[in-house]
Amino acid sequence: MPNDLESFINELLPTFPNLEGISDKVREAYLIIATAKFRFFLDPRRTGRIFIKDILTSPILAELYDLRSEKSPEEFLSNWFSKQNASKLVELFDQLDEDKNGFLSIDELSKFQWGLTRFFLSRVLDRYTKEENNYEMDFKTFVEFVLIIENRKTRQSILFFFECIDVFGKGYIDAFTINMFFKEVMQKLLTKDSEADKNFHIEDVKDEIFDMANPSDSKVISLYDLYKCGQGDTVLSIIVDAKAFFDYDQRELGNTLNVDEDSHFQIIPGLNDDEEMEEEDNNANNDILGMSKPAVKTYGKFAEV
């Protein structure tokens, strides 16, 4: 049975000219794609409920309603809810799913973005997939993962990265953890530059990470430290993403690592940073932690998602 948000979006679909001629395959996936963005930005704590007023005042709803306007296909490329973006996500998943079993294995997911290390992706699968699916990623989880990767500045993305990196569940990241993840970053860089190990040194990287995080305890970095420092996304990315690390290290020189030929993924549109932070501020005032997930109906102020 569809939940409130799915029903709401489904009723709107016939009013969107952009979705005319959408293929049956993309149509089946569309509600997963559309509802994922609302859940990601408006229900970051995964309570299963969103405030109705947050939906009505959100720029995400405005982006959805923009599908009613008459625009060229090219003008819709930056709209998450467009037929073009939905088709891109479905096609990307199909390309990665080489054995066509409807799930992404660690080998298949490793082709998503070149920079992400295999160790990090294995942690993603361990934490956010199910044993009955052989710890492989289904399409719904993949769409959520895309949103996480492309909106790294958000608190929900920082939490996701932190939980994957906190291998021992201690509630903090220490020098040992950084070294454990970063050595695979170095291995990836060595495939692009045989002298990478001479140019980058783990001790310097760890010092830089702790300087950015500015933790209250000089030996460990907590989730709160990452939220507070304003650079949590950068700290976490350079630990698990070889391209992110290289681009950060070379930022003053303007150098970037070209890995387009090694990745299937091209950037999927999301909110800009200002809109992301606005959504987070709204949700910070609407803490509904501890409330149970409602039945499939609207409870006055809430919609089930």
Regions found by a protein language model. Give the residues of each.
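Amphipathic regulatory helices of Ca2+-sensor modules
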Residues: M1-K25, I50-Y65, F103-F120, E136-E150, ...
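Core solenoid repeat modules with strong leucine/isoleucine-rich periodicity
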Residues: G48-I55, E63-S69, F76-N79, K83-L109
